[in-house]
Structures are given as structure tokens and as C-alpha cells.
Amino acid sequence: MEEQEGTLPQKADFSGWYNDILWRAEIMDVRYPVKGLYVWFPFGFGIRKRVYGILRELLDRDHEETLFPLLIPEPEFMKEAEHIKGFENEVYWVTHGGTTPLDIKLALRPTSETAIYPMYALWVRSHADLPIKVYQIVNTFRYETKHTRPLIRLREITSFKEAHTVHATWEDAERQVEDAIARYREFYDRLNIPVLISKRPDWDKFPGADYTIAVDTIMPDGRTLQIGTVHHLGDHFSKTFSIQYEDTKGQQQYCHQTCYGISERSIAALISMHGDDRGLMLPPEVAPVQIVIVPVIMKKREEEIMQAAELLEKELQNAGYRVKIDTRDLRPGAKYYYWEMRGVPLRLEIGPRDLDNGVVMGVLRSGGKESLPRADIIAEVNRKMTEFTAILQERAKTHIKDHLVMVKEESLVNEMVSKGVVAVHWCGNRECADRLEEIADASVLGTEVRTDLIDQTPGTCIICKKPESVVTLIGRSY
């Protein structure tokens, strides 16, 4: 790729920066000839593989991975009216097999409840069969009519992790919701992405759910991005699909269920939260290349320098690091540009003077050079990686703090929401919420906010002045 054609827009121009970095850093190619469908570059897919590796690790503690079909028969898909009402305008339908019209239309899954739950009705017989905890990572299809954007708003979601659990009681399902929230918080902690967790208002919950807990983060332009959801489904779907078990008294009972999902929006958040004007900045755990070694060649000592670089590479690889030596016939500056764009956490430079002094020059992607003793290189690299991770964490935390503000005057809501997420007191009345959304030109995101960044003490509703109103988040969203 000609990644050096022009320069990356400054991150202050977030839309331009985001669109450019996807191809300059070789994450996604947007030129596929169907709107809303994109192609993963190998480097971008390497990030995806490691991000979803963390997710698999967290879920595999007590979930089992599975795979259900992409195609859903229309009669099964249409069974749950409230659920389908939320998706019917977004469904792709398969109507022909070759040139032959199908007797029954088949939906390309927009989500998998109606594919999975008919099978659960066959699998569950007794209380001994419970709980069921499975997940799959699949592609889903939604006919988005809004403006599509890679990783954020797609017609093919290529990396949808959806978990579906079945329990004996509502309370068991509620405990599973809390477990899923904790799992997602741990996932985003490892990506160094601070999150805001809240309960969506009833009119914005998942179709067919008792309630929805959402995981949001704040993008560089102050808009929120929903990067995870957890839904308590109650016995709504089990009644529709006849998912029942025999309890210890021999009575038939309907099951209670949960589902929770994360998509490649997690990677959009990763890119956006940590990147800067020079490109990506990737946490070491998910960087396809963690360390790049750049030999600084002097012709008379080229062989000696290359041998030293190869020995260094092998030593670092044996310590568990993903390492590349850049041997391309390019100026050092061009190599630095290339690897900085791709967010490699640490660059090690080794030249004749470094050889003579028994050191390696270390440069973190966040900036700053340091001479590292060659004899202690593994310990030194470990230290630098820890330092880099701490820098990412602190920068991200500062960003969220700077874009989350408590507002107590109605007249200030619109001005402040243009800069980020606003916390207000809201009585829970839909009319007050509608008024809030009107004056803010934004959405009510949720209540029961789980963050220590704002005071959660109840107060007076910002609209109707009712006392003992709860803290609620307002924001403009992708």
C-alpha cells in the first residue's frame, strides 16, 4: 500500500482521521462493491484475532462455544412478535434456491434468538439440564438504511459474539446478567478502554427483554459508542418457543434466559480511544507486532549489526514477544512512519554505536527514547511494556473524565452535550425524557449508572423538579 500518500488527518478531525486510519494502518478495505460490507486486511484481522482471543478466554471459563446456522426459517423467525418488530425492516431474505422459489423464505440472521431457541426447546427437559451457557462468534446481517461506517454501523457484522444462557429462575438469570457485566468490564479493562455501564430506558431495551444493560464508551468527538449489551429475557422467549423443564417436584416450569453480545465495535473503540495524529497505538496484548527491531546499518559493519538484530529477535521471541526485524531497503524514517502508523508498542534501534556501548535504543509508541542495557534486555522490555500500558490507561481515563459532566440547569444541557456525555437527574417519566431529548438533541442513554466518575446521589429532576430523581446519562450516539 502507498500509505505515505499524503498525511493522516489530525485526530481533532475525527471523522476524517478514522476513515483514513482504517486503510493507512491496513485494518479494513472499504472498497468492496456492496454498501456496508468491508474486507479485513491481514494486519487488521490480526488485531481482531487477539481481541476476540481475550473474549474467548473469559467466556471459556464456564461457557461452551457452539455454532448455529445462518439461515432461519420464516415461521420460526416470525414467532416472537415483539422481538421481530425490532428487526423486521432490517432483515435480508433468501427467496430462491438457484432459480427455484423456496416454499419457505429464509432469513439471514440479524441476531440468533430465533435460530437457537427452537433447539433449546429440544435440549431442555429437566432441571438437571440447566443452566445452559453457550456462545458463538459469527457474522450477522442487517439492512442498515442509515449511513454505514466500517466497524461501527455495518450491513454485515463480521464478528458478532453472542452468548445465550438458560436458567431455572428469574433470579438465576439476573445473577448471570451480573456475571456477564463483570466479564465485559474485565474485557475492556484489558483493552484499556474505560466504559460507562447503565440500564437502558424501557423504550430502548432489546425487543423482548425484561431489561437491557448497555456498555458505552465515549469517542474522541464526544459521541457515545455502544460496545456491548446484556439482556435479561425473563421467560418471554421460553414461552414463545416452549423451553420448559421439570422441576424437583415434577412440575413443568418455563425457563428464564439471558443473552449478551459484543461486536467489532470493540475494535472501533480500541482504535479510536488510543490512536493519535501519527496512527494507531495498540495495547501490547492485542498488537500483532509488539516489538519492531530497526537495524541502523553502517556498510562496513552491516553483517555484524544484522547478526546482533537477529540474536535480539530470537531472544525476545523466546521470551514470548511478537517481534519483527525491518530489513527493507528504506530510510529509517520511512520505517519509523510505517510501524508507528500500525501502533507497534516498542521500537528497538540497534546500530554500530549501540553495539559498541552494549545498549539498544528503545522508543515507545507514545514517545520518548531510552537507552536500554543489552545484557538486561528482557527485563527492560518488560518494564517498557508496563510503562506503555499505564500511559494508555491514564490517557483513556483522562479522556472519559474530560467528556463526562454533571449538569443541573436545563439551559446548559444542549451546550454541554455537544462536548460529550451529560449526567442529569431524571424522574423516570417518559414526558420528561422526551423533553430532555428535544432540548439536548440527544438520547437518554440509561440509569443505574455504574461509574465512580460522577456523584450518584439522587436529586431534583432537571425538567419537572421532582425530588429523589436518579442520575441519568444523556448523549449523542453512533
Curated annotation (Swiss-Prot):
GO molecular function terms listed in the Swiss-Prot or TrEMBL record: ATP binding; proline-tRNA ligase activity
User: Key word Ligase present in the record?
Assistant: yes
Provide the assembly information. Homodimer.
Q: Where in or outside the cell?
A: Cytoplasm
Q: Pfam families this protein is in?
A: HGTP_anticodon, ProRS-C_1, tRNA-synt_2b
Q: Which organism is it from?
A: Methanospirillum hungatei JF-1 (strain ATCC 27890 / DSM 864 / NBRC 100397 / JF-1)
Q: List the keywords (alphabetical).
A: Aminoacyl-tRNA synthetase, ATP-binding, Cytoplasm, Ligase, Nucleotide-binding, Protein biosynthesis
Q: Which GO terms describe its biological process?
A: prolyl-tRNA aminoacylation
Principal subcellular localisation of the protein? cytoplasm
Q: What's the protein here called? A: Proline--tRNA ligase
